[in-house]
Regions:
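Non-catalytic substrate-recognition and accessory regions of acyl/acetyltransferase enzymes
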Residues: 1-52, 141, 145-169
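Acyl-donor binding region in acyl/amide transferases
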Residues: 18-117
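Noncatalytic linker/hinge segments flanking ATPase motor cores
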Residues: 64, 75-81, 122-128, 163-168
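Active-site/acyl-donor-binding loops of N-acyltransferases
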Residues: 86-155, 159
Length: 169
């Protein structure tokens, strides 16, 4: 359970882009199902692929798309809380380079996704749903792009739910 027993991977044109490692557990305080994220890994040399995927999702960042996919999975299986590892909580600190600089700053990303450090300082508590701006909040020049992006994200959510439901039968 160091990084996770399960993973969700994001591919574009048959090539892996991101992988998120996690495990399922029961919340110690209320017994509800939770997900603990142990790691989020991106590609070594995937800049062109990332650009392609970002374009395919109308400007939505691939790292955010990966986390959105996990949120869709969590909703489909009835998870009510998601906890994401902090930089300090990451067991191996493998994301620290030889020169001691972070390769990946988990904290910055989780905070960007509205995560808040919880009482167990090794984890952020993450919202299970992503905030979407209303069309009125967006510049008129960005509305069509966001409408297409949200439609694509809704397709992804439906596909994840259908895949999970097929295993429930």
């Amino acid at each position: 359970r160091k990084e996770g027993c399960m993973s969700l991977a994001l591919f574009y044109e048959g090539e892996p882009l991101y992988q998120i490692m996690f495990w399922l557990a029961k919340n110690k305080t209320d017994g509800k199902n939770v997900i603990y994220i142990g790691a989020l890994q991106g590609p070594q040399n995937g800049n062109e692929l990332i650009k392609g995927m970002t374009k395919a999702f109308f400007g939505y960042r691939t790292k955010n798309l990966m986390f959105y996919g996990l949120r869709c999975f969590a909703k489909a299986i009835g998870v009510e809380n998601i906890f994401a590892v902090t930089n300090d909580g990451y067991y191996a600190m493998n994301h620290v380079r030889v020169d001691r600089k972070l390769k990946t700053d988990f904290g910055a990303f989780w905070q960007e996704c509205e995560g808040v450090i919880c009482s167990d300082r090794r984890f952020y508590i993450m919202p299970t749903a992503e905030h979407r701006k209303s069309m009125e909040e967006l510049k008129p020049s960005k509305r069509a792009q966001h409408r297409r992006r949200f439609a694509k994200m809704d397709e992804m959510k439906a596909a994840v739910k259908a895949a999970v439901d097929s295993y429930k039968k």
